[in-house]
Amino acid sequence: MNDAFAGLPYRPCVGVMLVNSQGRVFVGRRIDDKDGVAWQMPQGGIDDGEELHPAALRELSEETGVAAELVTIIAESREEHLYDLPDELIGKLWGGQYRGQRQKWLLLRFAGEDTDIRLDAHDPAEFSEWRWVEPEQLPDLIVPFKRRVYRQVVDEFRDLI
């Protein structure tokens, strides 16, 4: 990381590992992904004064259309997970205010049907398509600078999935 960015803070964020009854995990392909390589789990910023669980349910609803009554919170990550953006993205995302994200992750069990997932629930949409994948596939689907975090989250939640 460029030393000029080292003093920037991390953006507070929540991530959601949404699992179905078969133990597969929801991933969405980012709508701004032109190369088909940016699949990720729902995640997003925590608003000022917002608590973690409501933030997770809000992000889940905005990005997937899944209503809170269709999920059960199973676990919360023990610690925050940090990642740094590549230098070329720091000035482009979040108004250049952050060097990356500090994320708390929640594991949620999905009790709905696939038809309850609606990527058009929020405008603008976050994802262009979605699928269920095996947890071990997650690190290979995400952009490289987030892979370490995805490995940590899979390792932490593996026995609960």
Swiss-Prot record:
Provide one Gene Ontology biological process annotation. Answer: ribose phosphate metabolic process
User: Where would you find the membrane-spanning parts of this chain?
Assistant: none
Residue ranges of the motif Nudix box: 44-65
Instruction: Identify the Gene3D superfamilies for this entry.
Output: Nucleoside Triphosphate Pyrophosphohydrolase (3.90.79.10)
Its top-level enzyme class, in one word, is hydrolase
Pfam families given in the database record: NUDIX
> A GO molecular-function term, please?
bis(5'-adenosyl)-pentaphosphatase activity
Domain Nudix hydrolase stretches? 9-155
Q: What is this enzyme's EC?
A: 3.6.1.-
Q: Which cofactor does it need?
A: a divalent metal cation
Task: Report the function annotation for this chain.
Answer: Accelerates the degradation of transcripts by removing pyrophosphate from the 5'-end of triphosphorylated RNA, leading to a more labile monophosphorylated state that can stimulate subsequent ribonuclease cleavage.
Q: What is this protein called?
A: RNA pyrophosphohydrolase
Q: Which organism is it from?
A: Novosphingobium aromaticivorans (strain ATCC 700278 / DSM 12444 / CCUG 56034 / CIP 105152 / NBRC 16084 / F199)
Which gene is the coding source of this polypeptide chain? rppH
